[in-house]
């Protein structure tokens, strides 16, 4: 959240919006751990670079005593995603904030802090945004995808994400979260994302019923054991996964609007 504050001070949200799992966790109380920061430009700009915002991020981190550096990732020339990392020494920061702690309990954490953030520099049209205000770590403003647009991104991920040939369980968990909170989907954004991914043809007569059919087909193909194993490390109440099955996901998809 300190990184988000630094980006805000640098004017980043005049040209980009926040979306993805971490946006859900921070602003909509998704009960799943997520730390990567995902953004999309408000309009395509293939020449966009993140470097101009690095100083703002580093200054914000240093204001809170965090000695972290920001570095960019070499971009694949054919990719629409530009990436950067915030990195630092975990041990240094544990000692700084908890000088009397027994470090044995942090054995699993004693590696470099590494937060990835990615920006889609050529996003499809159709997203809807809202401006939100955060008071902590200090007052700042963020441009955020609407809940409906966030849901569109999640459905696109379920249908199209190429993740080691498997469905990412975290996507399924978030799908249940959206439906449980009665969030409708931004159908225009889903359509445009699916067209961009060559999942559907541009001339298709696309509507909510067609989308449900695509999801039902997908939910019939998923290995739910593997999907559960993916999400287990990121949630506290693992019993909520017991019901996961083809029939469960097909049934709740009837509630999609």
Task: Tell where the protein language model's regions lie, with residue ranges.
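Structured mid-to-C-terminal alpha-helical surface segments
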Residues: 1-16, 27, 42-257
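Short glycine-biased active-site loop of nucleotidyltransferases that positions the nucleotide triphosphate
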Residues: 25-34
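Glycine-rich beta-strand-to-loop/alpha-helix junction loops that act as flexible
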Residues: 19-22
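Structural signature of FAD isoalloxazine-binding scaffolds in flavoprotein oxidoreductases
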Residues: 37
């Amino acid at each position: 959240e300190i990184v988000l504050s630094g980006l805000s001070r640098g004017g980043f949200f005049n040209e980009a919006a926040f979306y993805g799992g971490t946006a859900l966790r921070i602003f909509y109380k998704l009960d799943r751990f997520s730390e990567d920061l995902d953004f999309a430009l408000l309009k395509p700009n293939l020449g966009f670079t993140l470097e101009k915002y690095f100083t703002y991020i580093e200054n914000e981190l240093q204001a809170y005593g965090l000695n972290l550096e920001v570095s960019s990732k070499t971009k694949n020339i054919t990719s629409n995603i530009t990436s950067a990392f915030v990195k630092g020494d975990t041990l240094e920061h544990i000692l700084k904030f908890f000088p009397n702690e027994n470090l044995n309990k942090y054995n699993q954490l004693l590696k470099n802090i590494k937060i990835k953030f990615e920006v889609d520099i050529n996003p499809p049209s159709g997203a809807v945004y809202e401006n939100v205000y955060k008071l902590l770590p200090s007052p700042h403003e963020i441009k955020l995808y609407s809940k409906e647009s966030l849901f569109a991104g999640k459905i696109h991920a379920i249908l199209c994400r190429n993740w080691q040939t498997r469905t990412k369980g975290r996507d399924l968990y978030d799908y249940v979260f959206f439906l449980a909170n009665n969030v409708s989907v931004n159908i225009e954004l889903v359509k445009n994302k699916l067209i961009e991914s060559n999942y559907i043809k541009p001339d298709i007569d696309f509507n909510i019923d067609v989308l449900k059919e695509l999801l039902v087909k997908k939910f019939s193909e998923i290995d739910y054991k593997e999907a559960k194993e993916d999400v287990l490390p990121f949630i506290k109440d693992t019993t909520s996964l017991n019901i996961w099955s083809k029939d469960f996901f097909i049934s709740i998809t009837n509630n999609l609007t």
